[in-house]
Regions:
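Residue position within the beta-strands of beta-propeller blades
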Residues: 1, 5, 34-39, 86-91, ...
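Structural motif
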Residues: 1-4, 43-54, 96-106, 147-153
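C-type cytochrome heme c attachment motif
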Residues: 2-4, 33-36, 52-54, 89, ...
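Multi-bladed beta-propeller domains
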Residues: 7-21, 57-75, 106-123, 158-173, ...
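Conserved beta-propeller blade repeats
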Residues: 20-35, 43, 71-90, 120-132, ...
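Beta-rich catalytic cores
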Residues: 22-24, 49, 73-75, 99, ...
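Residue-level signature of beta-propeller blades and closely related beta-rich strand-turn architectures
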Residues: 40-41, 92-94, 143, 208, ...
Length: 334
């Protein structure tokens, strides 16, 4: 499954996500960005066997991690943007019916560094949290056992304690509660996407910049080029016992002495990056998949840099040159 936008009447559908694996239902932030759960990488490979919460503009641009989930329960989902400065979600381990698990949240102020366990499900499982206009929280809850079902409960907004029962129906699961109330209108967003184009641009200020353990060697250089790896979608001819995602090399581009690179690639194609040394050996690789939309210019500060840092006020050497074209590009630079 993928994310699509459309006109209000359902016409003119347009795809805006290109993960090689399925993504889950989104919610909308007040600034108009969409939040959704997706695999961090290829399930079962390269540390990709867990989902993260991702953010994206409603035109498919600027895909970024909202909650990376490097070490939490593997299957966060059921994302709900609260009215209280929190984003709620379910943390599942794959054992509870219908993907139930604990309730957790991150704050809108620091989503990358604020993951908090809200309500543990040691004696059952939660699903579908809902932040209410009156400051309360609802969630579906199912006690442990084979003959139980999900019912709707009010949850204490501070302690996560399960309070009074709101609704139940014997033999049925009560899920996906919605509040019939006035909701703040989200902001509109301008778009750089030009559907007459077929490429976009990735640029990096310095691949020497990183905050990840094990990548300290990048700070002193060592990466001579960047390789773009493309995910190839399944077809009717794909073998059932093959890898979950086929990969092929789209191409390589040089990294300048200051660590910068500037590359034009086909749009709407899932890609990941690998940094190579002068002999062609891999010195670092990206786990997650990303893409650019037509005529999008997507920049990053470094290689797994601190996402809260300010971009250095420098002009990368690669930015003074035309982007290196990889794949069958038609050329977007103007």
């Amino acid at each position: 499954t993928a994310l699509y936008t459309s006109d209000l009447d359902g016409g003119n559908p347009r795809r805006i996500s290109y993960h090689p694996s399925s993504v889950l239902a989104p919610d909308v932030l007040a600034n108009g960005r969409l939040l959704f759960a997706a695999w961090r990488g290829t399930p079962g490979e390269n540390g990709g066997s867990r989902r993260a919460l991702m953010g994206i503009n409603n035109d498919g641009t600027d895909l970024m991690a909202f909650h990376d989930n490097h070490d939490g329960p593997p299957y966060p989902h059921s994302v709900r943007v609260g009215r209280d400065g929190r984003v709620y979600f379910v943390e599942a381990d794959g054992t509870a019916p219908l993907g139930g698990g604990d309730l957790a949240y991150v704050t809108l102020r620091r989503p990358l560094h604020s993951r908090t366990l809200f309500a543990a499900s040691s004696d059952g499982a939660f699903l579908d949290p809902l932040s209410l206009a009156d400051g309360g929280v609802l969630a579906s809850y199912r006690p442990a056992g084979d003959d139980t079902s999900y019912s709707l409960y009010r949850i204490h907004p501070s302690t996560g304690q399960r309070l009074d029962l709101v609704h139940e129906k014997a033999g049925f699961d009560v899920l996906d509660a919605q509040e019939l109330a006035t909701h703040p209108r989200v902001q509109g967003r301008s778009s750089v996407v030009d559907l007459s184009k077929n490429t976009g641009v990735f640029f990096c200020v310095s691949s020497h910049t990183t905050d990840r353990p094990g990548l300290e060697h990048l700070k002193s250089g060592g990466a001579a080029s960047v390789r773009f790896v493309e995910a190839v979608p399944f077809t009717k001819k794909s073998t059932a016992d093959g890898p979950r995602v086929e990969e092929k090399t789209l191409g390589q581009a040089p990294i300048e002495n200051d660590g910068s690179f500037h590359v034009e690639v086909p749009s709407g194609v899932p890609l990941r990056f690998e940094l190579l040394d002068e002999e062609g050996g891999t010195v670092a690789k990206q786990v997650s998949w990303t893409w650019v939309m037509p005529r999008e210019w997507r920049g990053c500060i470094g290689c797994h840099e601190d996402r809260e840092m300010v971009v250095p006020n420098i002009m990368g050497d690669a930015f003074t040159k035309r982007a290196v074209q990889l794949g069958q590009t038609g050329g977007n630079e103007e």
